[in-house]
Amino acid sequence: MATKKKVLLKVIILGDSGVGKTSLMNQYVNKKFSNQYKATIGADFLTKELMVDDRVVTMQIWDTAGQERFQSLGVAFYRGADCCVLCYDVNVAKTFENLDSWRDEFLIQAGPRDPDNFPFVVLGNKIDLENQRVVSQKRAASWCQSKGNIPYFETSAKEAINVEQAFQTIARNAIKLEDGLVFPIPTNIQVIPEPQPAKSGCC
């Protein structure tokens, strides 16, 4: 069986500053977590190679700054994305309420070909602080359903809960978009010869 070509996927993680975007990315790629918070300046990315079904996938994960003053950087980073991850902190209501504006911002800046079917994944992070939770799982799931059944995971970058599973889903959804943009070459092409001019001859 012929090996399928390698796939490069661009994934953008969006959300308010402090929700754990960098920590989720580091936990998934490097299996590391740091309690020291350092705000991302502009944008940064890590890559990870993984197998999805029978193909090798290289995922380029972009972690963008949550501060408003960096949102003007959006167009350059959002364009060409194959999946957008919307991240919030289950213990801070405002970070969940801002998901709408992050989603809208992405669709405006990235300008995907088919915005209604563009793959998003929502991550409710910091579930290790369960006693501080203010956004219920039901409320988040309801929001995701209202936006076209966006896949939803509750995660903990600190405890590595659901991080691997979430990024597997992110990769699968991104591949679906990539596959949809590949236009198959029809096999039933007919070549019609050009008509030859009639030869003049003696009667």
Swiss-Prot record:
GO terms for cellular component: autophagosome membrane; cytosol; early phagosome; early phagosome membrane; endocytic vesicle; late endosome; late endosome membrane; lipid droplet. It catalyses: GTP + H2O = GDP + phosphate + H(+). A lipid is attached at residues 202-203 (S-geranylgeranyl cysteine). GTP binds at residues 15-22, 34-40, 63-67, 125-128, 157-158. It is found in: Late endosome membrane; Lysosome membrane; Cytoplasmic vesicle, Autophagosome membrane; Lipid droplet. One of its GO terms (molecular function) is GTP binding. The keyword Hydrolase applies. Belongs to the small GTPase superfamily. Rab family. Small GTPase which cycles between active GTP-bound and inactive GDP-bound states. In its active state, binds to a variety of effector proteins playing a key role in the regulation of endo-lysosomal trafficking. Governs early-to-late endosomal maturation, microtubule minus-end as well as plus-end directed endosomal migration and positioning, and endosome-lysosome transport through different protein-protein interaction cascades. Involved in lipophagy, a cytosolic lipase-independent autophagic pathway. This is Ras-related protein Rab-7a.
